[in-house]
From Swiss-Prot:
GO terms for cellular component: ribonucleoprotein complex; ribosome. This is Large ribosomal subunit protein uL23. Belongs to the universal ribosomal protein uL23 family. One of its GO terms (molecular function) is rRNA binding. The gene is rplW. Keywords: Ribonucleoprotein, Ribosomal protein, RNA-binding, rRNA-binding. One of the early assembly proteins it binds 23S rRNA. One of the proteins that surrounds the polypeptide exit tunnel on the outside of the ribosome. Forms the main docking site for trigger factor binding to the ribosome.
Length: 101
């Protein structure tokens, strides 16, 4: 059993992009930014507990931070982890709460 305080630290934010919106509409999949040390089992448990939905599958990938230039200095953005969470048919997560009326 995964501790509740760990589950609250696993999910950081939903990742909103053109691709994530398209995947959400077609495949009933939600994209999250997650902790870099999070496992698929932890991500599944966190989504099911926090949003009260059933998760069918979880796919993860590590996003490598890009090197960026600021004036004459070179910097690097942080690496982060992305999770594609596929929900069971008929399940849905509403982030805006009916604001688009």
């Amino acid at each position: 059993m995964i501790r509740e305080e760990r589950l609250l630290k696993v999910l950081k934010a939903p990742h909103i992009s053109e691709k994530s919106t398209m995947v959400a509409e077609k495949l009933n999949t939600i994209v999250f930014k997650v902790a870099t040390d999070a496992t698929k089992a932890e991500i599944k448990a966190a989504v099911e507990k926090l949003f009260e939905v059933k998760v069918e599958a979880v796919r993860t990938l590590n996003v490598v931070g890009k090197t960026k230039r600021t004036g004459s200095r070179m910097g690097r953005r942080s690496d982060w982890k992305k999770a594609y969470v596929t929900l069971v048919e008929g399940q849905d997560i509403d982030f805006v709460g009916g604001a688009a009326e």
